[in-house]
Every structure is written in structure tokens, then in C-alpha cells.
Amino acid sequence: MNEEQRVRQERFKLLMEQLLIPEDVTANHLKDGKIEKLTIKKDERRWHFQLSIPTVLPASIYELLADRLVQTFSHIAKVSFQIQYGQPDLSEQVWQSYWPLIVAKLTNISQPLKEMLEKQTPRFDGKRLVIQVGNETEAIALKRKLTEPLQQAVQSFGFPAVQLDAEVKESKQAFEKFVEQRKQEDHSKVVEAILEKKKLEQQVEKKMKEEKLTIGYPIKDEPVPLETIVEEERRITVQGYIFAAETKELRSGRTLLTFKITDYTDSILVKMFSRDKEDIPLLQAVKKGMWVKVRGGVQNDTFVRDLVMIANDVNEVSGKETKDEAPDDEKRVELHLHTAMSQMDGISSAGAYVTQASKWGHKAIAITDHGVVQAFPEAYGASQKHGIKVIYGVEANLVDDGVPIAYNEAHIPLLDSEFVVFDVETTGLSAVYNKIIELAAVKVKNGEIIDRFERFADPHEPLTNTIIELTGITDDMLKGQPEVEQVLNEFHAFIGDAVLVAHNASFDMGFLNTGFQKMGLGEAKNPVIDTLELGRFLYPTLKNHRLNTLCKKFDIELVSHHRAIYDAEATGHLLWRMVKDATERDILYHDQLNDNMGEGNFHRQRPSHCILLAQTQEGLKNLYKLVSMAHVEYFYRTPRIPRSQLQKHREGILVGSGCDKGEVFEGMMQKTPQEVEEIAKFYDYIEVQPLANYEHLIEKELVKSREALQEIVANIVKLGEQLGKPVVATGNAHYLKEEDYIYRKILIASQGGANPLNKQTLPQVHFRTTSEMLEAFAFLGEEKAKEIVVTNTNHIADQIEEIHPIPDKLYTPKIEGADEEIRQMSYNRARKIYGDPLPEIVEARLEKELKSIIGHGFAVIYLISHKLVKKSLDDGYLVGSRGSVGSSFVATMTEITEVNPLPPHYVCPNCHHSHFFNDGSVGSGYDLPDENCPKCGTPYVKDGQDIPFETFLGFKGDKVPDIDLNFSGEYQPRAHNYTKELFGESYVYRAGTIGTVAEKTAYGYVKGYQSDHDLHFRGAEIDRLVTGCTGVKRTTGQHPGGIIVVPDYMDIHDFCPIQFPADDRGAEWKTTHFDFHSIHDNLLKLDILGHDDPTVIRMLQDLSGIDPKTIPTDDPEVMKIFSGPDVLGVTEEQILCKTGTLGIPEFGTRFVRQMLEETKPSTFSELVQISGLSHGTDVWLNNANELIYNGTCELKDVIGCRDDIMVYLIYKGLEPSLAFKIMEFVRKGKGLQPEWIEEMKKHDVPDWYIGSCLKIKYMFPKAHAAAYVLMAVRIAYFKVHYPILYYASYFTVRADDFDLDTMVKGSAAIRAKIEEINGKGLDASPKEKSLLTVLELALEMVERGFSFQKVDLYRSEATEFLVEGNTLIPPFNALTGVGTNAAINIVKARDEREFLSKEDLQQRSKITKTVLENLDAHGCLEGLPESNQLSLF
């Protein structure tokens, strides 16, 4: 090899490294490659590589090389390349592997020809590529059209020119046979490929259980931290946790794995391409939750605009896992913990905590969220799974509803008393640890200040900046001042027997009494008045009762607030006003003041935190009652529990003293030992936490130092010993792992100044191990630390019973005789329709269903649903069913649903003769041809949708029925309120929901945090932070139609607490505190949903006088609109739509209209298929659509709804239980087991059907589809036969956005507006997209010969379009900027009398100037003068 060739080879090797081509690929396929030439066109930004490689590359390696070349240099230039092979060995196998790539290069041929070629597998006989065709004409056409483009495509891969030939099959019949055979082979191959894939996946899974996953070579390199990757790298190794992973099949057939990895210093996106078929299951085995080591290069990805790692090797490794290594009998129990249900504060789920505690070997764990118990159901589920005790609790906001106004009560007249109004300024809040620096007072008699006292005291220590800013007192002002003892002595003499008065007296008296006691004077015995509490009683409507707020109310001057003398003087003047107001309420004596304490003042008290743990099942119910009271009766900013209510419902509850916001900790900081002792007596156990949790108190200068904190904690421990109460060490955990800290920080930051935690450094509050907690309390000594961390926490846990937070069975309301009533109702209606005796098929179905329904206690659910539907029907509104209720024939016979699930059949309404088609030959009874009864000649009624009962209540008939009903949107509130009549107001609640932080919202929080802290996160790191913040509780709400019914022999608190949705005390309904899914199997949930269809039907009935139940379901003219618009008297070009289904529910969207264009349905059953196909996932696209397009089967044969599978397989001869199991697996996207496939094949189930089952991810119930289609067909009937009525109902009920100015101008203007919006594409606003649908209907309407008038001041309605001949008069609220309330007010004012002027219109209808201008601009105020004034000449 000469020097030039060696250089070319070295350059090629370097290029492969730059492209991050795996080493094994280079060694096996690209070893002797060279760069022969590189052509660069700078002005066009184009590079062209000419490469030489000795042997032909496998197609997959060619693709890899092409992908990497284009991707790597895409940010610099547009890259192309040509390969020259030394000795191209072009076997038939090579041609066939490259054939999809060759066809993909044929861009200038027709689509049908291209699709025909894609299905070919050409033969190669050494010189010719042979393609099979149907006849000689096709052969000539193929050679003429394809020879030249094919040669160009072939040569672009570096292959020599090849001759193209077409081989004609012997006959058309033989060709068709060949095509059919090829189809069958293709379907078999699909099934085999899927099974082979599953087999490989199972092998990989099995291998991974035995050993860790390795893709590529083992990695021995040391990983670098992700935060150090700031630029492109040729080769680097990283290690971390995968938090997102997905595999995607590329068009080329190769698989791309992308995953996001973090080491908690940063995150990065990793890509890896499969090299061969064996790689694919390995790539698919890479999952979220794995720890991996990755080796590869880092490059700038222009698509994601970020640094991305291209992996060559991936090795699974052991993750870093925290363990609790304390001996089993010496492990702690966490008694204070917050889950993601602590609103915008807790991060980790209850399940994650319980799982971790179980892994660590803890015997129990408590759940104590802020004010709520919404994590209980999840915690309970996890406890059952892991066999660990969960202690159910809450961190409550405790308020004193009995805070005294007066202390040391005395029977002395207020108006005649002498008062000393005083104020102290101090070095801090603690009467124990801080000192008085100023004491000032005024003596008040008969409203006059008769004496003053003002002294500074030298604390002999520097003041903090906070105190200097707050009080204006400086160190210099205090130097040389008297000792505090001297000041207190003088003050003691000054007060004499006067009544002492202070604002927030407990604070000032605390310092005074502490000082007096130290000097041996004893506590002051004087009567005391607290003006703060007196203000709360006298003036409850004030927003707060701070001194400055109260002074402002009475115009009392307050200068230098927070200086003792000025505060005392202002309080003195204030006191006298308050005393006079009190006497007006007949409060004349000091000892009468406390008669009024606590009256409605729960919301004025500052809450203190405490922990409530349910000790017994009775205690849990009491806890639920307290949580309900806190949310319903005592909610003010937060849910609050008055101390008196806690005392009443304390049975079975352990009360703990809580965190630093609890009374005991605050008392130990601020009050005398005697006061703290009194406070602590209220609690069952005392709580202390790691010093880190309290360090913000040092930050805020409320505590001097860490040593002072240690002293407070030690004093609390001693206090517990004195009182004989257990002291426990708790972690106050808000998340699972230390690294989760950032998520909480972002969530707290998102709340801005509204959250006081933003004013402090957040402590590290992860779920701590035993050793971490012991270390945190080491300053107490090893023995004491172990006692509070291990011994006492276990002691508390042992006192608590195993509790069930939700019952373990269904409790339905009891209605006397419900079982018999449902049985009789079902049989009576069945006999009325089918005669007596009933046909065997009818009776068998009824008995089968009634046995399950009555046997499992579900009859009452049917009866309630019947009553609700009957009430709506009696009130004139149809009810549509949804979900699977239409699978129940009993539901049909009790008139809960109109869908009849029996096999398609004829039944005579006169003599009841019937004929059933139970062989699968008919899809829907509505599709049967019209026939007369052979017995009596009466026209048959046609019915039956062939739906198995099992899809509703399960194969054993024991699944709790979920009866969803679509009521008219305008009737829905009446239906809801009817449940109160049926069951009583205290037994019905709206189903509660919990709104969590959504991904989009979390993204905003992360971006905001990044901006506020001047940070730059990689895209993958943003995704990690978003994931960490997603799912945290943000608010609560209510299900749009769900009503929970509590039986009258139970109490809601046997199941859960209650609250108002979003804590809105003005809401009409209370909701369940738990998310309704949590109690779905325990209480009856009625789904009383609001829907437009019944409202439209009611309006059409009112306008036409036609009973919707009499509308035929097989009207041939109506069926035509599903395949074209001709029946409407318009063309596709006129209405810009290829079907007539614009505005028809379920069939008007672009997606479904496209399906209709491709399938041309003409029967009811095919419409049901379309409905099922459009709602499923992977049922239509890449599945049924291909089968129909390829001619494999027709629309009626494909799998559309879940029930089709069971029915079809039973008709094929499979056991019903297996058919049901297969249906359940397929509908949930779980595919098929190999043994089921064998069984299906035994019963001649075709391969295409099996292949279809394997692709499906989710399926729609047929009963739901049938109910929807029934409503759609009725509405379509009016569109065809009563068009102007249809358009009036559509625009009134369904449309929200209008452009009336355009609509009144006719079709040209409407078409231009449609084209304008369509021209914007993705840039069109949501409002414009909504308007587009309305404009499409408006265009169709005017093209059919109808028109719109302008809004008319005297003829328009408020909210309904009016029909006048062939034109519609729009309502006021259809005008832009005119809301419904304004529209109603205009009509109301108009009905009173005519408008004299625009001024009169605005004044009497109370509309805004903007609304008036909109009416005027539209032209409906023509001729109306501006004002009421008349000019006289």
C-alpha cells in the first residue's frame, strides 16, 4: 500500500470515529475502507464523500453509515456520499435486503406503482431483477416506466447496472391465486415475526434475571460526572439512572433506542441504533428505573438542539441504594411524613415511602400530610402488598377556639377601672432565652392618660439586625442604661393594682412574669385584658387585628410602630374605644369578657401544628370527622381543627406535639417552663426533629445559634421525662431521597411570596435511616438518642392497631323489594315485546343476567338508574347510555339503555313472533331488510346488536356495574338534585377528584426556576426536573357527573372525609375527600353526565314535533351522508368536504371523515365499527385500514369493538371463557399467549385476525359505540329531511365561536375565511380552529340554499337560533363580545318595553359600552338614536 492510499485509509478510520460507528462494525465491515475524494461546495453548504469499500455492506450497516453521516454534519452542511465496491458480490439475498431501500429512492414514480413494488420480493438470476405482474400490458408498462429510474437508484448504492424484467403469471386466475397466497404468507409472516419477537424478548428477560444486561462490549472505564460534559466528546463513559426510555422502529426496519440518564449532577439524552436483528430485544430491554454505564461519543444534535450521547456500549450496573443497616430489632419508625398529597409541598408518593420502609425492614410507617388524608388509599394498597403496618395520621392545624380575652378575672367595672397599658421590646421572641430592652406604659383613667412609664434596659449583648430594623433601637441607645431588674422593680411599683392591658398580651405578660419570677416577685396577679382578642371579638369583619389596623379604624395616630412608648400610647387610646363598644353589648365587668371568647374566632387564631394518629378503627372514623369539620366548617386559608372539637372526638387518636410550628416547641422557645409544662400536658407524646429542620430559626434570628437549638431540644426531652410522656424523634420527611430536594425547592419557588418557605433556606428533609437519625441526635448522648429514635417510636407504633382506611366490600343503598322489582320489571317488558312464553334465547339471557345482578346485590343499582332515566324521560329529555351498560339486556328491559344486546332479530309488535340470527351472519338488527310477520302480516320491528353480557359485569358477573348515563347538559343539574330527593342530602356527594401538577405546568415551574436563579439546564435535565415535580397535589375538584351514594345504614365517615371542591365554601355540593377511584368498589357511584346530543334531540323534537324514538335507524337517504354529500343536494367542491357528516356527532371530525372516505359505510353495524375503530388505539391505523386497503377483508369483518372479539371467537367454536379472556387481554393491549394462537388456528381463525389482535393497544365497548351511533343517526335524519331545523339546533347547542359578519355575507365570504384559517396551518389559534368547524357547517348550510340574517334587536333570542322560513336569525350571544348574561338582560329589558335609544338600551339592560359597540357595529341598532334627549325646533 502506497503512502497516498494509507492516508486515505487513515482518514476513513478517523471519519468512522467521528461518526461514532461502533468498533465491532468497523472491524467486521469497514476495515479497509478509504475516502477517495471529498467535494465541498461552500456557497451551497454541500459536502459529497466518495468512499471505497472492498465488499458490499449489509443493508443495515449501509443505513447506519448513511444516518450517521447525515446526522453528524447536518449543522455544517448537507451531506451526500457514493460508495465504490471492489468486488460487489450481488446475491439474490443482497438484492432482497436492499430492495426496500432501492424502492424508497424511487421518488418520481406514481404511488400505486411504488406500493406494488414495496410488496414485491424480486428474484435475481445473476443478471436480471425479475418482478412478477398480472399480464403482458402491465409488464410493458412496468419496463417503460421503471427501467431508467431503477438503474439510477441501483447505481446510487454503488451497484453495477442491472437489467429489469417482468414475469407474467400464467393467467389472471393464477395471478389472483398468487396474490392471495402472498397475502396469506404475509399475514403468517407477521404473526410469526411477532411471536419470534416475543420469544426473543422472553429469552432476554430470562437472561436479565440471571445476569445484568450488556449491549456491546463490557465497560471498564471510570465514568465522568454528567455536569462536566459541556462540549462534543469523541469517547466518554458516564453512569446513572434511566428516568425515561423508549424504542422506535425506523422505516428502514432498524430500531432506535433513546433514553435519558441522570447521575443527579446533570442529565443527558442517549441514542443507540440496533446493528442487527439480535440487538433489537436487547435495546427493548433497556427500561426506566435501570442503572447503567454507557460508553460512546457526545455530539451536537441539530434536531433537539442540544448535546446528545451516541452510545456504542451499554452495561447494566448496580444502582446506588441507601440501606438501613441497623439491626432488625433496633430500627426506627417514622411518625411524621408528607407525601405528594401535601399540597405543593410533599414530593414522593405514599407507595414509594411504604416500599422503601419495607425494604429497610421498618415495622411501620406513618402518613401525616398537611391537613388531608388523601394518601391513605394508596398507602393501604402498598401496605397490603409489602406486609408493613401503615399508621394513618394527619398534620393538623390546631386552633384555640377558647383563647381568653381576659386573664386573672375580677368582678370590677370596666368604665371605672384604672388601666396600665404597656408594651415591651425585646431581643427576641423567647421569654426564656431573650431579654427586655424597653418597657413603656401609660396609665389610663376615664379615657385619659394620667401617667407614663418609659425605660430602656441594657441587655449586655449586641442586638440583631432584625431587632434594630423592627424597633429602631440601636446598641448605642442601650449602653449604660439600667439593668432589667431595676426597670422591672420600678414597673412593679408603677402598676399597683391596675388592670394590665397589652396587644397580644400572652407575649408581653410572658416576659413580665418571667422577669418578676426571677426577681422573686412572683407572677403578676393583676387583672389582664388582651386588646388583640378583644378586637377579634368586637370587630370580626376586619381583615386582620394588628395594632396599626385597629388604630386606623378609629383614626388613632400610631407613630414609630414597634417602639414601646408609642405602641402603649396608641393602645391606651384604642382600649378606651373598645371598652365603650363592649359596654354597649352589655359587657360591663372584667369577668364578663371571657363569656364571649371563641365565638366564630377559629379563623382569626394563628394555627399551631400537631400530629393526629388513628390508634383504633374508631379513632380513624373520628379522624375522618375532624378532617371533614376542618374542611367544611372551619376552613380558613387552611383546614383548621378547633381544640374543643379535637377534645370531643379524641377517642382512639394519639395526639403528638408536631414540628417547630407546634405549641410545645414554640413554648419552649418563648414561654416560661411552667407555661410549657401546661401546654405539653395536652399531648400524648412529644416530638423533636433533627436540628437541620430547625436551622431556619437561626436564619430568622429567632434562635441565636445551633447550641441554643440543642438546648431547646434537650429541654423538650427533659420535659417529656418530667411528665412521663414519650419523646419521639421524627424526620418530617417531604421526599424519599436526598437528591429529591431540588423538586421541592422548585415547587416552593413556584409559589412566590405566597409561601413563607420562600423566605428561608429549605432544610434537607428526606426519609432518613435509623443511623442518620441517631447521628442527628448524638448531642443528647448515645443512650438518649436511641431511646427517642428507636425505642419510643416503636412503642408508639405498637400502641396502634392494624387499621383499614377504606372498607373491603361494596355497600349499596338498600331499597326494599329492589330484587323482585327489577325481576318483575325485566320480565314484564320482555313479555310485552317478545310474548309469553318468552323465546328460549330471551329467557335464557334474562335468567343468566338476573342471577348475577341479584346474586351480587346489584339490583338496587339498576333500580336507581331506572328511576333517574325515567324521571328524565318523564320530564321530556332522552337519555343516552355510554360505556358497557348496553351489554346488559336487563338494562334494556328496565329502560336504562336503548341498546338491545341480543343477537340481531325480527320481532312482531302485534303477535310477538320473533326470528333470531345467532350465527354471526348479521352485524346489527337495524340492518335487516324490512319484512312482514309471516304469522299476522304486521311489519316486523328490527333490533339486536349482538353484545355479550360478560363485557359489562365480567365473566363471573361479579364486577361492580358502572352505569354511565348521558343526560342533556341543560337537564343534568336537575338529575343531580333528584338524587338528593331519592336518598337525602346527607347521603349524596359529588365524586371528588385530586388535581395534580401536570407536565406542562411543571415545565413552566422548572423554566421559571432556571430563569430566577440564572441557570442553564440541558433538555434532558429539564425533563428530569419536570418529571420530579409532576404528580404533586395542586388542588381538588369534582367529577363532572359522578354522584357518590352512601347507604342510609352507614355514615360517610365509615369511608372517607368530605370537603368542598377546591375548598370553595360557596360550592353547591360537597365532595368526597378521597379521589373517587379510591372508593369505587366500596360505594355506589352514579355517572350522571351532561351531553349535547340529548339537548340537540330535545330541541329538534320541540321544533319538529317528531318523537325521536320513531325515527328509522335504516333510512337509506340518511345512510348516504356517510359516504358522500350528494344526498344533501351539494357537491364535495361546494362544501369542501367529501362526506355529508359535518356536525354529526362522532362522525364530523377530520379523522373520522377520512375513515368514512376510505370505507364508505352503508349500514348501522358498519357505523358502529367506525365508532369503535376511531376510539381505539392501534385498531384502525396500521391495522384495520391496511387490511381493508389491501383487500384482505371488508369493513364489516375487521375488529372494531372489544365485544366483536368474544362473539367472533365463540362463533368460531372457542370456549366462551377463553374467548372472554382473549378479548380482555387484547383490549388492554396485552396481546395473545402462544397457546391461545394455537387454539385460534385450530378453529380456523385467519392469520390476519390474529395479527390484528397482536397490534391492538386499547378498544372501545360496542354498547358505547352503538349508543353513540343511534344518537348520531337520529340527528343525521333531521340533517337530511329537516335541514333548517338541524342547523338551528347545531348552532344553538354545539357551537361556541361565531363570525356572524362573515356568515351573513354568504358562501364566498365564508369560503374565503375558511381558506384563510386553513392557510395558517399549525399557527391557527385554538379559537380559529373552533371557528373553522362552525364555518364549515355555515358554508354547507348556505350552499344548500339557506341563509343567515343579522342579529335583530327585536326578533333575536338570547341564546337560541330562530328559524324563519329558509333563514336563521342568530341570538345575541352569538355576537363576538356579547356574553350569555348580557344577552339575557337585553331580552328581559326588551320584553318590558321598546328601547328609546342606545343610552336607554345600555342603562336598562346593564350592558357594557363594549357590548353596545359590538351590537352597533353588527348593524342591529340601526335607527336607534344615541340618547333619550329630543331637539325641539
UniProtKB/Swiss-Prot annotation:
The keyword Phosphoprotein does not apply. One of its GO terms (cellular component) is cytoplasm. Keywords: Cytoplasm, DNA replication, DNA-directed DNA polymerase, Exonuclease, Hydrolase, Nuclease, Nucleotidyltransferase, Transferase. Its EC number is 2.7.7.7. It comes from Halalkalibacterium halodurans (strain ATCC BAA-125 / DSM 18197 / FERM 7344 / JCM 9153 / C-125). This is DNA polymerase III PolC-type. SMART domains: EXOIII, POLIIIAc. Coiled coil: none annotated. InterPro entries: DNA_pol3_alpha_NTPase_dom, DNA_pol3_finger, DNA_PolC-like_N_II, DNA_PolC-type_N_I, DnaE2/DnaE/PolC, DNAPol_HHH, DnaQ, Exonuclease_RNaseT/DNA_pol3. GO terms for biological process: DNA-templated DNA replication. It is an enzyme of class 2 (transferase). It is found in: Cytoplasm. It catalyses: DNA(n) + a 2'-deoxyribonucleoside 5'-triphosphate = DNA(n+1) + diphosphate. Pfam families: DNA_pol3_a_NI, DNA_pol3_a_NII, DNA_pol3_alpha, DNA_pol3_finger, HHH_6, PHP, RNase_T, tRNA_anti-codon. It comes from the Bacteria. Residues 419-575 form the Exonuclease domain. The keyword Acetylation does not apply. Required for replicative DNA synthesis. This DNA polymerase also exhibits 3' to 5' exonuclease activity.
